[in-house]
């Protein structure tokens, strides 16, 4: 596995896509990073650009302080402006090749592949750094999402040479099964950010990758 691939392992925290005070978001993100998140993805589809840039810069600084990777969801231009480590793209977002041309060879680009291994193989061939499958469990973030079964992660781990991320309804009480099935990362939204003690929940999740 490449050096980038070695860094793509562990708890991958994703900010909730709901209106949130930037200081509250920053405080919760810092707690999650203290708890051991290795990556932090900023996802906000509703705020205006100035607010998103302000939040992204604050989160980027936190990641720098804690030695974590900072990823921006969808918005390649914003990722460039704030110096993010990379972007996460959905199937309907900017084509991977175009994003790579804008961000450069060193940027991390992840691709959502839902429950389809064929999409993951195509993403790998196109130069993706990781792929994400989900929803693994019922998700409050995307209640209508197609489910990705646990055996998919085992098959993906045997087939792909890039890291595999699991997303969708994951929390500390159910993450062990998908990690055992082959996920290199677990992307968690409400399972950390919506908890009374985000740091403690992040610590529980991060510890699952240390055994």
Swiss-Prot record:
Annotated keywords: Magnesium, Metal-binding, Thiamine biosynthesis, Transferase
Record InterPro entries: Aldolase_TIM, ThiamineP_synth_sf, ThiamineP_synth_TenI, TMP_synthase
MF-aspect GO terms: magnesium ion binding; thiamine-phosphate diphosphorylase activity
Record-listed 2-[(2R,5Z)-2-carboxy-4-methylthiazol-5(2H)-ylidene]ethyl phosphate binding positions: 139-141, 169, 189-190
CC cofactor note: Binds 1 Mg(2+) ion per subunit.
Pathway field: Cofactor biosynthesis; thiamine diphosphate biosynthesis; thiamine phosphate from 4-amino-2-methyl-5-diphosphomethylpyrimidine and 4-methyl-5-(2-phosphoethyl)-thiazole: step 1/1
Database matches in Gene3D superfamilies: Aldolase class I (3.20.20.70)
Gene Ontology terms: cellular component: cytoplasm
Record field: catalytic activity: 2-[(2R,5Z)-2-carboxy-4-methylthiazol-5(2H)-ylidene]ethyl phosphate + 4-amino-2-methyl-5-(diphosphooxymethyl)pyrimidine + 2 H(+) = thiamine phosphate + CO2 + diphosphate; 2-(2-carboxy-4-methylthiazol-5-yl)ethyl phosphate + 4-amino-2-methyl-5-(diphosphooxymethyl)pyrimidine + 2 H(+) = thiamine phosphate + CO2 + diphosphate; 4-methyl-5-(2-phosphooxyethyl)-thiazole + 4-amino-2-methyl-5-(diphosphooxymethyl)pyrimidine + H(+) = thiamine phosphate + diphosphate
GO terms, biological process: thiamine biosynthetic process; thiamine diphosphate biosynthetic process
KW Signal (keyword) present: no
Enzyme class: transferase
Residues that, per the record, bind 4-amino-2-methyl-5-(diphosphooxymethyl)pyrimidine: 41-45, 73, 112, 142
Necessary cofactors: Mg(2+)
EC number: 2.5.1.3
Protein task: Condenses 4-methyl-5-(beta-hydroxyethyl)thiazole monophosphate (THZ-P) and 2-methyl-4-amino-5-hydroxymethyl pyrimidine pyrophosphate (HMP-PP) to form thiamine monophosphate (TMP).
Official protein name in the record: Thiamine-phosphate synthase
Organism for this UniProt entry: Thioalkalivibrio sulfidiphilus (strain HL-EbGR7)
């Amino acid at each position: 596995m490449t050096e980038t691939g070695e860094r793509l392992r562990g708890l991958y925290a994703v900010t909730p896509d709901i209106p949130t005070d930037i200081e509250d978001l920053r405080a919760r993100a810092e707690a999650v990073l203290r708890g051991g998140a290795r990556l932090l993805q900023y996802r906000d589809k509703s705020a205006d650009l100035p607010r998103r840039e302000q939040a992204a810069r604050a989160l980027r600084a936190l990641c720098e302080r804690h030695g974590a990777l900072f990823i921006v969801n969808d918005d390649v231009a914003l990722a460039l402006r704030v110096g993010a480590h990379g972007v996460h793209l959905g199937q309907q977002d900017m084509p991977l090749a175009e994003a790579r041309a804008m961000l450069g060879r060193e940027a991390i680009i992840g691709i959502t592949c839902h429950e389809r291994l064929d999409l993951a193989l195509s993403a790998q061939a196109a130069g993706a750094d990781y792929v994400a499958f989900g929803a693994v469990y019922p998700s409050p973030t995307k209640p209508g999402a197609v489910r990705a079964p646990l055996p998919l992660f085992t098959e993906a781990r045997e087939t792909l040479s890039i890291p595999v991320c699991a997303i969708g309804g994951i929390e500390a009480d159910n993450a062990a099964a998908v990690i055992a099935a082959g996920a290199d990362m677990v992307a968690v939204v409400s399972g950390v950010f919506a908890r009374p003690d985000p740091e403690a929940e992040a610590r529980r999740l991060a510890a699952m990758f240390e055994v």
